[in-house]
Amino acid sequence: LWWLPESGLLAAMLALLAAACLLLPRGAPGRLLGLLLWLPLLWPQRELPSGPGALDMQVFDVGQGQAVLLRTAGHALLYDAGPRSRSGFDAGERIVLPALHALGVRQLDMLMLSHGDADHAGGMAALVASLPIGQVRGPAGMGQPLHGHCQADDHWQWDGVVFTVLHPPRHFPYLGNDASCVLRVDTAHGSVLLAGDISALVEQRLLRAGSEALAARVVLAAHHGSSSSSSGAFVQATGA
């Protein structure tokens, strides 16, 4: 199959006009020129971030789980892969992968799994089987095969956007939710904080390490908004 990015309204209207042209009687002048009006469907606008420091963030609706796409001008990172349930429903295959196709994402530079629970890492296998992925990273000790681990103070820069891992520190034991990779993304227009499923205990540790690193314009609530996370002090420190 040849996957095409989702087209805009203008391209769809031009395609309908092209179909109307082709339905004209044979011999009608310019009838076959209607084929040219289908070209915008083949090369749709991808609406990528433009310029240094720009970021596009898409939070996919995967139900009880998480999958977040972060795109700079030339790179793409997926934070978590969506859930896979015991019934066999795989959000990585049914939701995340079609959404990536619709957005024109043909490969991922990185898949970062916050931790190994099925609602965050369950869709990994479907994505790895279907997309070229530069590297898969997650906390040390999780069961899934990884190319490398996320550790505090890891940082890199793509197209003027800076990515920094705040948690877990080196040699931190794998504790499931509380071992989640906490990722901070600094752009030219503000910061994003992705906290996985950490609890208030880890939030307190991050506060002791320095609340200035938590200040962000956008925060995705930890552990799906659980009452065991998003403590008052943490929320106040983010100022989101």
Where in this protein do the model-derived segments appear?
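Transmembrane helix-bundle segments that form internal channels/tunnels in multi-pass membrane proteins
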Residues: 1-58, 71
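Conserved beta-strand hairpin/beta-sheet module of binuclear metal-dependent hydrolase folds
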Residues: 51-98, 102, 107, 176-200
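Active-site HxH/HxHxD metal-binding segment of metal-dependent hydrolases
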Residues: 116-153
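Proline-aspartate-enriched helix->loop->beta-strand connector
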Residues: 105, 133, 237-240
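Short Pro/Gly-enriched beta-strand edge/turn motifs at strand-loop
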Residues: 49-54, 159-170
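Short acidic-hydrophobic surface loop/beta-edge motif
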Residues: 70, 151-160, 183-185
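Structural recognition of the beta-strand scaffold that forms the well-ordered cores
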Residues: 76-80, 109-113, 135-138, 193-195, ...
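Active-site-proximal loop/helix segments of hydrolase catalytic cores
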Residues: 60, 92-96, 114, 118-127, ...
